[in-house]
Structures are given as C-alpha cells and as structure tokens.
Amino acid sequence: MSVFGKDELAMRKFASSMPVPEFEETHFVSTKPLSQAKVAIVTTAGLHRQSAPGFEIGDSDFHYETLARDSRDLKLGHHSVNFDRGGFAADLNVVYPIDRLEELAVEGVIGAVAENHYAFAGNQSATVSEIRLDSGPHCAKKMLAENVDIVVITGTCPLCPRTVCTLAHVFEAAGLATIVITRAREVAERMKVPRALHTVFPPGLSLGKPRDKVFQI
C-alpha cells in the first residue's frame, strides 16, 4: 500500500507541489479515426520480461524496455514503495491494458494493436531531462517506424505523473497522438498535456480494480 493510502488530500498536495518541467509549446496531433488507428501502450511502471535485468534503483535509469505484443511474463520493476503492487499481481491490465486493447481491436473499436509496447521507470529526476532529450525521442522514432498512430500512457507511483506528462509532450512533438491516464490532475494541468484522463484510483491502479474488464475498457 502506498504511504499516501487513500488520502486524496495528501495526494493532491503532493501533486501540486511537485516540481515539473516546462514546455514552450503543447503540440496536438490530429490522427486518423480510432477505428483505423494502430495503438501502442507506454507505461512508466518499469515493466520488463522476467529474463531481463530490469531497472536500477534511483532516478538515473532512463532507458526503456520493449514489450512484445504477446508477452505476458512481465515483472513490475518499479522500485518505489509508494504504490499498490497487489493490483498488478492480480491483473497486469491495471497498469498495462494490453488485453483490453486486443479486445477493442477484435471489436473494431481500434484499427490494430501495435506489435511492440514500451516501459520506462517513472521515478525520474525533477527535470526529466534524460527522457526529454534522449530515450523519449528514441522511443517515439521506434513507434513511428512501426506505424503507430496513438499512444496510451499510464503510470504507477506518485512521481509517475510528471514522467507520463513529459512523455506525452515528447511523443506529440514527434507526431504521435497521446492520451495520458493519471490520477494527478494538477500535474497534467500544470504541464499542459494535450489530452489526459483523470482517475481517482490509488497509485498502482491506473485503470481501477483488477479483473474489472468492463470498467477498464
């Protein structure tokens, strides 16, 4: 359980005082209809394959992991203690809604699911400069090369909102449409991201209760 627990006031106070990077411009990419779009997920939950070394402790690991579309043997490699890990243990879709995307593709709601998806660690430095200038643009180029149109971005820990919002700016500037899913409305508004869905769930449960397929969609 997060040290914040379900204390909404404490979470909002933390989000309001969190240092965030500034962007001179907010890009807003128009894309094809959703039913024709290829969608990828980028999460800051630090996910990686069981066989991979994963992420280092601290705020200096800005690399990203590539997650193949059919990979389910994933480990939650985010080292923060400030979020609920039980949800992911029960249902990876609470932070990485890959099964929900597959279902939406079958139903024709989205055009296609991307072949690869990506994971960063959300606990980055206050400037998030390494992701802004290095690994973020590199990840964007990979998705563009794979013909991705839309990126769904999710987080886990209390610091993740700053990282997911930074990634949204980086991806939109590269030509990818994004939607950020975050409980920290204050951070999304201060960072002026193009699109954000505000949730009220505890850290670690970006899409709500585990195994709640209807709600997660």
Regions picked out by a protein language model, each given a short descriptive name:
Residues 1-217:
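Metallocofactor- and cofactor-centric catalytic cores in central/energy metabolism, strongly enriched
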